[in-house]
């Protein structure tokens, strides 16, 4: 693997096993920060005496809102100050957010901590991708990323169980203590073992003008924005599910203690479909796969809506699990393809453009999930409608983007 390595660092890169292990942990921070909190929702609502339990969804939304701004800053910052600087700065900010959230005496105070966490975790999320790209190219990079993604896919499956384990023996605040301990440990390991990969002669001065120029180019480019908005809406639908899943399982199916196991089963759909997408995309292409997945998502969402309406909004656990699993499979296919299709047209502003696309998608996802989440009424109907709307908008936007590309 070292033969295909493209080294820009002054020190030799880590061995493949250590490198994969380190960056699998770094990239897992986002998913861990979201999914580990789900079992704690009832305890958080009780601790802060929330009048409306739907407000616990904001624990997820505010984290993603913080990422909206973080993704916009850390991309250019990693090109200016280096990958290592951006990753470590992001981890420090994330740890500050953990401390604030852990010690918050009000729900609003905890949400401020979560927003800071989201801003900070954008550093490792964005800069780690650039660092991997610095050190590996071609088949070697594809192999490294596939191993990292395998681990990343497992995190949503085990994170709720981890959160459940912590609150079984301690306060929900200790989940933030776990985040803090884990991040500090990774930061120490990363600082000692990983060299900077962006040498000073290759760094680009931080420029508000450049960010503004790139933003205008992307925001007024219909094709790029169509893919970015679609990705945001679909992530918003996923956040809608994540934000309401604990309540659905508790309110409708009286499942509390074993909720993490059911959530893990559903999350495995993303892993299965991501694996299949890697096999199928070279044969059928991103557009065909994406449109097929969107149409399938619309079909399954319609089925969930019909089943829900026929059962007063409370379908049997079997039907809910089956249809939700199939929806997760569709979303797993869509995420990677939509991002790749947006990146295809970025050209010479790919680095900065990736940050703007990610930030735009995150903003759309927050707006979608917060609005849709307020309609939760102890039935699965709002969830079905949310997925159906996401699929409908996605089909229209992706089809329109491809038509525009064909006419260019």
What spans do the regions from the language model cover?
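Conserved MFS/SLC helix-loop-helix module at the cytosolic interface between two early adjacent transmembrane helices
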Residues: 68-108
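Juxtamembrane intracellular "pre-TM" segments in multi-pass secondary transporters
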Residues: 5-13, 197-227
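Cytoplasmic helix-loop-helix junction between adjacent transmembrane helices
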Residues: 113-154
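Helix-loop-helix hairpin linking two adjacent transmembrane segments in secondary transporters
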Residues: 109, 138-139, 143-192, 198
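Extracellular/periplasmic helix-loop-helix junction of adjacent transmembrane segments
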Residues: 40-69
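Extracytoplasmic
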Residues: 18-50, 241-246
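Structural signature of the two symmetry-related core transmembrane helices
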Residues: 85-99, 180, 289-304
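Helix-breaking motifs and short loop linkers at transmembrane-helix boundaries and internal kinks
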Residues: 50, 82, 103-109, 120, ...
């Amino acid at each position: 693997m070292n033969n295909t390595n493209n080294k820009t660092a002054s020190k030799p890169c880590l061995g493949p096993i250590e490198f994969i292990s380190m960056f699998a942990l770094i990239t897992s921070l986002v998913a861990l920060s979201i999914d580990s909190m789900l079992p704690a929702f009832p305890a958080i609502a009780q601790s802060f005496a929330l009048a409306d339990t739907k407000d616990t969804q904001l624990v997820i939304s505010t984290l993603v809102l913080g990422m909206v701004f973080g993704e916009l800053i850390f991309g250019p910052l990693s090109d200016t100050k280096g990958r290592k600087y951006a990753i470590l700065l992001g981890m420090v900010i994330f740890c500050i957010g953990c401390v604030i959230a852990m010690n918050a005496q009000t729900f609003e105070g905890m949400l401020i901590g979560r927003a800071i966490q989201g801003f900070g975790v954008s550093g490792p999320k964005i800069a780690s991708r650039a660092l991997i790209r610095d050190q590996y190219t071609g088949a070697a990079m594809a192999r490294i990323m596939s191993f990292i993604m395998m681990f990343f896919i497992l995190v949503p499956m085990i994170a709720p169980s981890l959160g459940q384990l912590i609150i079984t023996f301690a306060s929900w605040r200790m989940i933030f203590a776990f985040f803090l301990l884990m991040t500090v440990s990774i930061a120490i390991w990363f600082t000692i073992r990983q060299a900077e990969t962006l040498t000073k002669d290759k760094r680009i001065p931080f420029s508000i003008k450049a960010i503004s120029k790139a933003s205008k180019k992307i925001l007024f480019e219909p094709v790029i924005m169509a893919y970015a908005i679609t990705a945001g809406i679909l992530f918003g639908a996923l956040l809608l599910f994540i934000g309401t899943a604990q309540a659905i399982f508790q309110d409708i199916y009286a499942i509390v203690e074993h909720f993490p196991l059911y959530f893990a089963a559903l999350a495995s759909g993303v892993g299965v479909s991501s694996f299949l997408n890697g096999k199928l995309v070279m044969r059928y292409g991103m557009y065909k796969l994406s449109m097929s997945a969107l149409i399938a998502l619309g079909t399954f969402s319609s089925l969930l809506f019909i089943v829900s309406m026929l059962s007063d909004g409370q379908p049997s656990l079997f039907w809910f699990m089956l249809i939700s699993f199939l929806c997760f499979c569709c979303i797993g296919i869509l995420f990677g393809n939509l991002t790749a299709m947006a990146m295809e047209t970025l050209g010479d502003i790919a680095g900065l453009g990736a940050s703007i696309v990610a930030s735009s998608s995150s903003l759309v996802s927050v707006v979608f999930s917060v609005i849709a989440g307020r309609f939760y009424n102890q039935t699965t109907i709002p969830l079905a409608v949310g997925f159906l709307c996401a699929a409908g908008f996605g089909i229209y936007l992706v089809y329109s983007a491809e038509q525009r590309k064909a006419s260019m």
